[in-house]
């Protein structure tokens, strides 16, 4: 038997207020069609599909009236690829991603990001679109104390897309992979996911160690593989321990060690190369591998 949903349940799924759904039903005729005896009308599978399409079209820039008309007149759900190809302005992409994150629409976010990365590359997508969305989400949480789940959801969706991009490398130009890690107890790893994906576009292969990488893991990888470059990320000051680059084992040829993240500061890091942005990190690593 088909599960029927209340207006509150559908509102949660779409990331809108129940009052908004009632307005859409009243103004545009896009609402619940199923009815259980002795209860309010409830939303069935087809109703939810139409509302999901309407929500995505609104996120993509359509007016609610146009989106409702399109959703009601289309027999099958429009492919996401067609919806996300309609953007020409970067600010529209930022707004769409932000709204899709609020709506927790994973498929829309992934499709839009894949399309954007295919058009502009990881570095431009990161700097022009993704970072602004993260800033918007972060500011909203700081101001209201709500929405921390949106940041986590969006970050994990981003990581999936970046891992997908990084896995597409087939013929790396570097026989010895670059080493990439978030050091110590550093839980933040989104930036190094972006870096690994951006390097993959240049056919530069990485050994990705991820978050909370202990020194022993770095030490073992350096001794085994003698990487041409090592990128160490620290978002927080308490995780930016200089021993992570000072005590690395000596290997030949010596690797290019780069530091990323706002955690690295002070005189201990003065002689190290710090990377101000993703593009700079990619260029430095490309030089280190001889690209």
Residue ranges and their predicted role:
Residues 6, 19-20, 52, 194, ...:
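Short Gly/charged-rich anion-binding patches and loops
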Residues 10:
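Hydrophobic adenine-recognition pocket in adenosine-nucleotide-binding enzymes
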Residues 13, 18-170:
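Long amphipathic alpha-helical segments
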Residues 145-291:
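C-terminal regulatory/effector modules of DNA-binding transcriptional regulators
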Residues 1-5:
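A detector for short, charged/polar N-terminal pre-domain segments
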């Amino acid at each position: 038997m088909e599960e029927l949903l209340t207006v509150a349940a559908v509102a949660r799924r779409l990331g809108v207020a129940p009052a908004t759904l009632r307005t859409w039903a009243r103004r545009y005729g896009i609402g619940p069609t199923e009815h259980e005896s002795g209860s309010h009308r409830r939303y069935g599978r087809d109703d939810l599909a139409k509302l999901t399409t309407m929500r995505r079209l609104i996120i993509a820039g359509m007016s609610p009236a146009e989106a409702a008309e399109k959703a009601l007149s289309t027999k099958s759900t429009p492919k996401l690829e067609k919806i996300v190809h309609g953007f020409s302005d970067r600010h529209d992409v930022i707004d769409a991603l932000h709204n899709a994150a609020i709506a927790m629409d994973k498929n829309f976010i992934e499709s839009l990001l894949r399309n954007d990365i295919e058009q502009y590359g990881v570095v431009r997508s990161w700097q022009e679109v993704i970072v602004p969305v993260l800033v918007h989400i972060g500011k909203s949480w700081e101001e209201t104390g709500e929405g921390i789940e949106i940041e986590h959801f969006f970050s994990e969706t981003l990581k999936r897309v970046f891992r997908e991009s990084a896995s597409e490398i087939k013929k790396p130009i570097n026989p010895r992979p670059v080493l990439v890690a978030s050091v110590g107890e550093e839980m933040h790893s989104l930036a190094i996911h972006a870096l690994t994906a951006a390097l993959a576009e240049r056919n530069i292969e990485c050994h990705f160690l991820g978050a909370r990488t202990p020194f022993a893991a770095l030490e073992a990888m350096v001794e085994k593989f003698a990487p041409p470059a090592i990128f160490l990320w620290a978002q927080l000051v308490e995780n930016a321990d200089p021993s992570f680059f000072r005590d690395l084992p000596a290997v030949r040829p010596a690797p290019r060690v780069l530091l990323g993240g706002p955690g690295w500061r002070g005189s201990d890091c003065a002689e190290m190369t710090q990377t101000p942005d993703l593009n700079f990190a990619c260029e430095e690593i490309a030089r280190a591998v001889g690209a």
